[in-house]
Curated annotation (Swiss-Prot):
It is found in: Cytoplasm. It catalyses: adenosine(1518)/adenosine(1519) in 16S rRNA + 4 S-adenosyl-L-methionine = N(6)-dimethyladenosine(1518)/N(6)-dimethyladenosine(1519) in 16S rRNA + 4 S-adenosyl-L-homocysteine + 4 H(+). It comes from Burkholderia lata (strain ATCC 17760 / DSM 23089 / LMG 22485 / NCIMB 9086 / R18194 / 383). This is Ribosomal RNA small subunit methyltransferase A. Its main location: cytoplasm. Belongs to the class I-like SAM-binding methyltransferase superfamily. rRNA adenine N(6)-methyltransferase family. RsmA subfamily.
Length: 275
């Protein structure tokens, strides 16, 4: 596989984190994993040169119900519009600022399926942005750096367990679906990739916790990973009765379950409401 940044006459742009998927066997496996069906509301983030776009359109799009795509690179937008016409509705702009809820069906029922080969340089911020639309989403399938996927699905007590693990596992059921080697891309990235499936919990399955407070607690806990929680969560010891929660502060952040972090955030909310 050539290391050239040019593919199909387009130079991959480093500032956009562009690595184009070119292995048709991998593309077929990804599409089979997604399982698109006619008439579904699907959004592709970063369609690039259309490697996934084409088979997705073949399986689900009609002029009345097109595949939606969010693309930042204006050079690619023109090519995609010319190639797919009315079967692809393109939204020019940055996915980090895009209102995905604007594409959902009317009503409260989840209706969106979101897919994409996400730019690795913005993957974590983009995942957190997408979390704000989770109530409108049926599922998400993303190509990401394998290290990020491992952190997303990591169990407590492992080195990969992180702030990203806690915040996403609170909101989604997640599963690593496929490994994708560097040679599947043009130009090949310097890291291994993987496909992850993310299914949002339904409202009745979610714990009653303010995600902002949960994020505050988790960020503090993981701010110095090698230190004990009695140090990183020390500022909360005057307001939260950790003993009453059965929460052992003589641990490190990666040794605490999602449910335990939720419990601390709930206790913090109760204290602040009372105060």
């Amino acid at each position: 596989m050539s290391n050239s940044r040019q593919h199909q006459g387009h130079f991959a742009r480093k500032r956009f984190g562009q690595n184009f998927l070119v292995d048709h066997g991998v593309i077929d496996s990804i599409v089979s994993t997604i399982g698109p069906a006619r008439g579904q509301r699907m959004v592709e983030i970063g369609p690039g040169l259309g490697a996934l776009t084409e088979p997705l359109i073949e399986r689900l799009a009609t002029p009345e119900s097109p595949l939606h795509a969010v693309e930042l690179d204006r050079d690619l937008i023109g090519r995609l519009q010319q190639r797919f016409g009315a079967l692809l509705e393109l939204h020019a702009g940055d996915a980090l600022a895009f209102d995905f809820r604007s594409l959902a069906a009317p009503g409260d029922k989840p209706s969106l399926r979101i897919v994409g080969n996400l730019p690795y340089n913005i993957s974590s911020p983009l995942l957190f942005h997408l979390m704000t639309f989770a109530d409108a989403v049926i599922d998400q399938h993303f190509m990401l750096q394998n290290e990020v996927v491992e952190r997303m699905v990591a169990e407590p007590g492992t080195k990969a367990f992180s702030r990203l693990s806690v915040m996403l596992q609170y909101r989604y059921v997640m599963e690593k679906m496929l490994d994708v080697p560097p040679e599947s891309f043009q130009p090949p990235p310097k890291v291994d990739s993987a496909i992850v499936r993310m299914i949002p919990y339904e409202p009745h399955e979610l714990p009653d916790v303010d995600p902002v407070l949960l994020g505050e607690v988790v960020t503090a806990a993981f701010s110095q990973r090698r230190k004990m929680l009695r140090n990183t969560l020390g500022d909360y010891r005057e307001t939260i009765d950790f003993d009453a929660l059965g929460f052992d502060l003589a641990r490190r952040a990666e040794d605490v379950s999602v449910a335990e972090y939720v419990g601390v955030a709930q206790a913090l909310a109760a204290v602040r409401k009372a105060g």
